[in-house]
């Protein structure tokens, strides 16, 4: 007899919703599981990067590794430094993770090899305006005072950003596929709060 927790049951219902009502490939619907699996961080990063490329039709690159952001997302008009975190109980404010994002945003702004010899920022399109870079956290859900992490990161970098939970990420993918959201409007959603499509 399969005993499901309330959370697992809700996720199963969400998966069924996306399978029945969207054209999102099942590979991406598995993000609903990966986002809650603390042992699946790398898979979560890789599949999220592919979702941005395949469904959102943005340029994206999974970076991972030491002293690099998890994912870069861009067009020739804007760039996003994204950090993914798979947490079973949600992502709450975390000073060391905020410090890491601040470092990435500032490294991208300054673009000095002395700051980081791997020069990961060179993956971005060179045509992106200097003031059109944003930061983004992606996780299962955001709990506690995570909004403080957004406002503090913004005030420390002079850049805007956002967070998005995995359900909203898939809602956004569905809206893009149905031509109900123009992905070039993504920068308008970077208001230092959690993105909610619906």
What are these regions (language model features)?
Residues 1-9:
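Nuclease-adjacent, charged terminal/linker segments that flank catalytic cores
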Residues 11-197:
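Catalytic core segments in nucleotide and nucleic-acid processing enzymes
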């Amino acid at each position: 007899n399969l005993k499901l927790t309330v959370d697992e049951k809700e996720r199963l219902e969400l998966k069924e919703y996306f399978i029945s009502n969207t054209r999102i490939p099942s590979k991406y619907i598995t993000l609903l599981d990966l986002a809650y699996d603390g042992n699946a961080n790398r898979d979560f990063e890789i599949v999220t990067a592919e979702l941005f490329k395949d469904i959102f039709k943005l340029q994206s690159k999974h970076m991972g590794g030491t002293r690099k952001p998890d994912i870069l997302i861009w067009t020739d008009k804007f760039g996003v430094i994204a950090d993914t975190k798979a947490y079973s109980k949600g992502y709450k404010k975390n000073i060391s993770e905020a410090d890491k994002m601040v470092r990435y945003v500032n490294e991208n702004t300054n673009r000095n090899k002395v700051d980081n010899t791997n020069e990961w920022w060179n993956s971005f399109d060179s045509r992106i305006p200097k003031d059109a870079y944003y930061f983004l956290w992606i996780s299962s859900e955001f709990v506690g005072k995570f909004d403080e992490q957004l406002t503090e990161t913004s005030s420390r970098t002079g850049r805007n950003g956002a967070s998005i939970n995995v359900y909203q990420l898939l809602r956004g993918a569905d809206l893009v596929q149905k031509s109900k959201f123009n992905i070039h409007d993504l920068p308008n959603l970077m208001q230092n709060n959690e993105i909610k499509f619906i």
